[in-house]
Amino acid sequence: MILKLRRLEMRPRAALCAALWLSACTSVPLPQGTSLSSYAGMSPSTGILAKARLRVDPAPLLAAQTVRIVPTATQIGSSGFDPKDLALVANAVDRALCTDLSDRFQVVAPSLPADLIVHATVTDIVATNRTAAAGSVVASLGASVAGLGVPVPRLPIGLGGLAIEAEAVDKDSSQKAAMLWSRGANIITTKARVSTVGDAYSLSSAFAADFSRMLLKGKDPFKGMPAIPSMQRLRASLGGDPKYDACKAFGTAPGLPGMVAARFGLPPTWTDKGAAVSR
């Protein structure tokens, strides 16, 4: 009898968990832009949270030793976003790509030849609702002050998202890897920030990790176990100098001040100074 009651009690809990999970992420389309040299031969591949279509040529990627990064562009039409916010998101993509690719490749300056040339384009940004984000921040901080000791999920409304397409071409402009990628914020792992590009900014590093892994390993980045971050990645994420001077063009990560700002839901512009050189 007790077991039967427990089963009956668990059913609404399971239904609630399922409902929360379904509402935990915002859905972001996977648009195809016009910035890639080719969209042929791309196959669907889906991670736990991201949607993607990709094409990868393993042999030339694994043989490559140097890479050059072309600054990320935006191709989202009349969006209503502040140009400074868009530039910050684009630069965050570049900075993360530069750091992640440094694990195996030597990143060279724009004026130097490279085995691979990487460029990305932001094709869509789903705006973060600042009012909803502020409510989530207040609820989270209130729980901390009350000493509940339990993380409070974000409100499942007004979540933002990001869509990007990117490719790596060789010296002859022949495409060796390409990816269409999109991902929405979720109520568990994406911290609310009171900025229309708050979630897009946070998700920029997730895209960079997926795309870089494809180039580093020469295969679908969504298959297999995620790698442990290298020491140079950790150092750069904490605001340290990057491994290669070419990455200094994208500025340094906000580090600990940025983490504190994210905890309090402050806009990324408060702590991220953006590119070190004009784009």
Task: Give residue ranges: language-model regions.
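Second-shell loop/turn segments in exported
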Residues: I76-L88, F105-V107, V152-P153, T190-V197
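Bacterial N-terminal signal peptides that target proteins for export
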Residues: I2-L16
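C-terminal motif of bacterial Sec signal peptides marking the signal peptidase cleavage site
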Residues: W21-A24
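A structural "domain/chain start" motif
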Residues: T26-N91, G218-R279
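Short secondary-structure boundary motifs at beta->alpha junctions and helix caps
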Residues: G147-A163, V169-M214
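Surface-exposed patches in mature extracellular/periplasmic domains of secreted proteins
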Residues: D103-D115, G218-P226
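Surface-exposed short loop/turn segments
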Residues: D103, S111-D172, A246-R279
